[in-house]
């Protein structure tokens, strides 16, 4: 197993853990509002789909999608605890241990995905081959 394969496996694990936690909290968040509950359903479905897609074929598109979902979840939680989410949950959410654990898992997933995304190589035109006149 290569280091890249291990990183993909950990990203799959982070997607699965986060999907499980979001799925377990759906009912509780539907009690707070339909929009908030629906958001947790969407997060669960997206994370589960990413875990499956990464297991089957971890393409750059799937990795970029995982990065987007993780970043979105982290940003939405930051908004939820600082200002609230307009329309969905205008009151500020209280910070709790499970939420912090989930966000730590998602941050690990995001950091690992960032290392797996390919960056285009920059052409280096100013270098000359060894032994050629300058």
Which sequence ranges carry the predicted segments?
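Membrane-interface extramembranous regions
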Residues: 1-134
């Amino acid at each position: 197993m290569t280091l890249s394969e291990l990183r993909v496996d950990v990203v799959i694990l982070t997607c699965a853990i986060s999907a499980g936690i979001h799925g377990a909290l759906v009912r509780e968040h539907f009690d707070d509002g339909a929009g908030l509950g629906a958001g947790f359903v969407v997060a669960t479905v997206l994370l589960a789909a990413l875990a499956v897609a990464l297991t089957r074929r971890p393409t750059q598109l799937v990795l970029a999608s995982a990065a987007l979902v993780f970043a979105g979840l982290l940003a939405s939680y930051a908004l939820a605890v600082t200002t609230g989410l307009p329309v969905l949950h205008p009151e500020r959410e209280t910070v709790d241990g499970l939420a912090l654990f989930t966000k730590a898992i998602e941050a690990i997933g995001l950091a690992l995905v960032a290392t797996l995304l390919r960056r285009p190589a920059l052409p280096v035109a100013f270098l000359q081959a060894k032994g050629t006149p300058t």
